[in-house]
Swiss-Prot record:
MF term (GO), any: ATP binding
Top-level enzyme category: translocase
Protein name: Putative ATP synthase protein YMF19
Native organism taxonomy: Eukaryota, Viridiplantae, Streptophyta, Embryophyta, Tracheophyta
Organism: Brassica napus
Membrane topology, from the record: Single-pass membrane protein
Catalyzed reaction equations: ATP + H2O + 4 H(+)(in) = ADP + phosphate + 5 H(+)(out)
Length: 158
């Protein structure tokens, strides 16, 4: 596209506006574009308001419940992945012992102390929306954070 000068300015501006508004109408007014999403969200808010709930609830107890559920879900995913890693390491270690080959050079296991747990839980509760820390306590989550597996590296297969 040539530089804007006195002779081509109007035609470039015309084609720019024509393409811009064509794509704007095509993207936003097809029902699935930006305007379509806003219509869907408005309808969803109306339907939920009839049930007595809204999407953006201002109730701090419901926010704490959501945070508690999210934290427990994250911990369960972490445990599931760590369990799979430990099972894989045990299987590879047995395979290596049978063939006299060391496949894993270093496998570390760090046991979290209660002081570290309290520090983690304190930092998480400090960042809660209500800033009271009621949504997470050491009694409920002390047994959730006990063991962290760290795979440091792999050796070469000989």
């Amino acid at each position: 596209m040539p530089q804007l000068d006195k002779f081509t300015y109007f035609s470039q501006f015309f084609w720019l506006c024509l393409f811009f508004f064509t794509f704007y109408i095509f993207i936003c007014n097809d029902g699935d574009g930006v305007l379509g999403i806003s219509r869907i969200l408005k309808l969803r808010n109306q339907l939920l308001s009839h049930r007595g709930k809204t999407i953006q609830s201002k109730d701090p107890n419901s926010l704490e419940d959501l945070l508690r559920k999210g934290f427990s879900t994250g911990v369960s995913y972490m445990y599931a992945s760590l369990f799979e890693v430990s099972q894989w390491c045990k299987a590879v270690d047995l395979l290596g012992k049978r063939r006299k080959i060391t496949l894993i050079s270093c496998f570390g296991e760090i046991s979290g102390s209660r002081g570290m747990e309290r520090n983690i839980l304190y930092n998480i509760s400090k960042s809660s929306p209500s800033n009271t820390g009621r949504w997470i306590t050491c009694r409920n989550c002390r047994n959730d954070i006990m063991l962290i597996h760290v795979v440091h590296g792999q050796g070469s297969i000989k």
